[in-house]
């Protein structure tokens, strides 16, 4: 009979690897030095540390003149938050080559160049908020006057799009529509446009794809515009954008896919990479769960099974709120 002590204190094999270790605060003097420990802390800190190393590798290759085309995908709530300014900076500095987002990621970026969103609270009387005309995104408040102001700009913008389409003899694609929106911002808006993703994408000629561009306030404005003008036709071409997006992946020597959240932007990017045999580098930041079979919760390894991420790709998934980790990730990579 085996003794209880022998069961509890069973001999183990030696394990080779990195010792778990955090920063000794007397020995660090900056956030940068603290982040240097992340890969050794464990749990999601280790995943963030790996993401830092992956993105640094991509940046080092690009600095040497090697082509790694960077695809950035994010859901609308990312732009609702203060991550908008970080993404705008990345575009301004030439760190991103292709963007895919949802309709909210477009319209909220434009609206914030008109009036800011306001920090609120999670615990409020939402029925009362509705009576007051204040919309809520988590603990971020968006008064309806933001959308009223947005409409004042969108109606003349739609008129311009109609003229462009008439001159061209064909509709704009969604990415061209967004590019023209950036041009419109450049002409019509003040200094606040300089913190806009759309504005800098226009200035740096970075395509922004939005396959579901009507799924939000832009769609609402299009509805009003079309209803009020009867048979006047404004068309946004989605089909040709899928060709453009896929070819941006196919023609790249290597690609990196950085995805905040899930849904449509995530799949549009990795599916485009399917046509080249998968992306070479992938960083996912998500709070979605994998066990419901959703695309949003699918880990990078599941993407390998579809051929959307290369089997030998360098990838990591961080289970965390992007507002907590993305600023640290960008700050550390770009300072390095």
From Swiss-Prot:
Any one annotated GO CC term: cytoplasm
Keywords of this entry: Hypusine biosynthesis, NAD, Transferase
Pfam families: DS
EC number assigned by the record: 2.5.1.46
Chemical reaction(s) catalysed: [eIF5A protein]-L-lysine + spermidine = [eIF5A protein]-deoxyhypusine + propane-1,3-diamine
Family indicated by similarity: Belongs to the deoxyhypusine synthase family.
Name of the protein in its database record: Probable deoxyhypusine synthase
Lineage: Archaea, Methanobacteriati, Methanobacteriota, Thermococci, Thermococcales
């Amino acid at each position: 009979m085996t003794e209880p002590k022998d069961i509890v204190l069973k001999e183990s094999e030696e394990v080779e690897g990195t010792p778990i270790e955090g920063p000794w605060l007397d020995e660090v003097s900056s956030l940068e030095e603290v982040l240097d420990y992340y890969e050794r802390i464990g749990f999601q800190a280790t995943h963030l540390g790996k993401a830092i190393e992956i993105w640094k590798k991509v940046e080092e290759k690009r600095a040497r003149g090697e082509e790694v085309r960077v695809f950035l995908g994010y859901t609308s709530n990312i732009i609702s938050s203060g991550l908008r300014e970080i993404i705008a900076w990345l575009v301004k500095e030439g760190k991103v080559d292709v963007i895919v987002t949802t309709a909210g990621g477009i319209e909220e970026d434009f609206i914030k160049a008109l009036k800011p969103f306001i920090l609120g609270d999670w615990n409020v009387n939402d029925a009362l908020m509705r009576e007051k005309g204040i919309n809520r995104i988590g603990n971020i408040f968006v008064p309806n006057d933001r959308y009223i102001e947005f409409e004042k700009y969108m109606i003349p913008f739609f008129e311009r799009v109609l003229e462009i389409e008439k001159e061209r003899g064909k509709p704009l694609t969604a990415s061209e529509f967004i590019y023209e929106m950036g041009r419109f911002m450049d002409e019509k808006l003040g200094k606040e446009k300089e913190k806009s993703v759309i504005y800098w994408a226009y200035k740096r000629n970075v395509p922004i794809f939005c396959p579901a561009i009507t799924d939000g306030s832009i769609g609402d404005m299009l509805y009003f515009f079309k209803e009020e003008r009867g048979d006047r036709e404004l068309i946004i071409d989605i089909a040709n954008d899928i060709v453009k997006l896929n070819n941006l992946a196919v023609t790249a020597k290597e690609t990196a896919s950085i995805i905040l959240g899930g849904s449509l932007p995530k799949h549009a990017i990795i599916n485009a990479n399917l046509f080249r045999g998968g992306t070479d580098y992938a960083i996912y930041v998500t709070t979605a769960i994998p066990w419901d079979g959703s695309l949003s919760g699918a880990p990078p390894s599941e993407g390998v099974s579809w051929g959307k991420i290369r089997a030998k790709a360098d990838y990591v998934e961080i289970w965390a709120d992007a507002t907590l980790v993305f600023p640290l990730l960008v700050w550390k990579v770009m300072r390095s």
